[in-house]
C-alpha cells in the first residue's frame, strides 16, 4: 500500500509543484498520508464499530486481496472485495445481515473461445459460485456489485440466474449507483436522489 501511494504522488509531482506556488498557494498538508498495512483480523475498533479484514481468493496470483466485515449493534455487513469462491469469505459471511458481493458473467461460448474472458471470470465470482456462497453463508440479504457482464448478458439475466440457482430462497438484488441500504430488522433498499438539491 505504501509503495502504491508513493507512486501515485510521484505520478502527480508536476501538478503538485504548480499548485503549491502562487497564485494557488496550496499547502502540502493535504498530501500527507499515514499508511497502515493490514492483515487478516481486527483492523478498526472504536465507538462500538468493529471492522475485520479477511483474505479472499482473487485468483491469478493476486496477493493481499481482502474482504471486510463490519459489525455494529448486533448488525453485520460483509463486503467481498474482488474475489471468486473463497471458503474464508463464506466463514466470515455466515448469517450476516448484508452481503455485498461482486459478480461477473459471460456466455459459455465466449468463455470457451477467449482465454482473456476465461481469465477475467477466473478473477471474479460467477453466478454459480455466487449461488454456492449464498447457500453456504446464508446471508439475510445479498447485493451484487462490481458488476462485470460480457457478451450481451444483462444484469436482469445474471440476477435471475443467481436467484434460480438458490431456488429463489434468498433475497438478492443488483446494486446500482446511489443505492441506499438500511440494515435493520428488515433490509430496505432505495434510490438516493440528489437531483433537486442545489
Residue ranges and their predicted role:
Residues 1-77, 156-189, 196-197:
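Binuclear metal-dependent hydrolase catalytic cores
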Residues 66-67, 76, 84-179:
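Cap/insert and terminal regions of metallo-dependent hydrolase folds
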Amino acid at each position: 500500500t505504501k509503495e502504491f501511494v508513493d507512486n501515485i504522488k510521484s505520478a502527480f509531482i508536476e501538478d503538485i509543484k504548480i499548485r503549491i506556488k502562487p497564485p494557488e498557494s496550496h499547502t502540502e498538508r493535504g498530501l500527507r498520508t499515514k499508511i497502515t498495512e493490514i492483515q487478516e483480523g481486527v483492523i478498526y475498533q472504536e465507538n462500538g464499530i468493529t471492522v475485520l479484514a479477511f483474505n479472499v481468493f482473487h485468483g491469478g496470483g493476486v496477493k493481499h486481496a481482502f474482504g471486510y466485515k463490519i459489525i455494529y449493534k448486533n448488525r453485520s455487513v460483509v463486503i467481498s472485495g474482488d474475489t471468486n469462491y473463497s471458503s474464508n469469505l463464506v466463514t466470515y459471511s455466515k448469517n450476516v445481515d448484508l452481503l455485498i458481493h461482486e459478480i461477473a458473467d459471460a456466455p459459455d461460448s465466449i468463455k470457451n473461445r477467449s482465454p482473456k474472458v476465461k481469465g477475467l471470470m477466473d478473477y471474479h465470482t460467477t453466478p454459480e459460485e455466487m449461488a454456492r456462497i449464498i447457500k453456504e453463508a446464508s446471508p439475510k440479504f445479498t447485493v451484487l456489485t462490481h458488476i462485470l457482464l460480457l457478451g450481451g448478458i444483462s444484469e436482469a439475466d445474471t440476477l435471475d440466474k443467481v436467484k434460480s440457482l438458490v431456488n429463489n430462497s434468498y433475497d438478492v438484488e443488483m446494486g446500482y449507483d446511489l443505492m441506499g441500504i438500511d440494515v435493520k430488522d428488515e433490509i430496505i433498499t432505495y434510490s438516493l436522489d440528489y437531483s433537486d438539491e442545489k
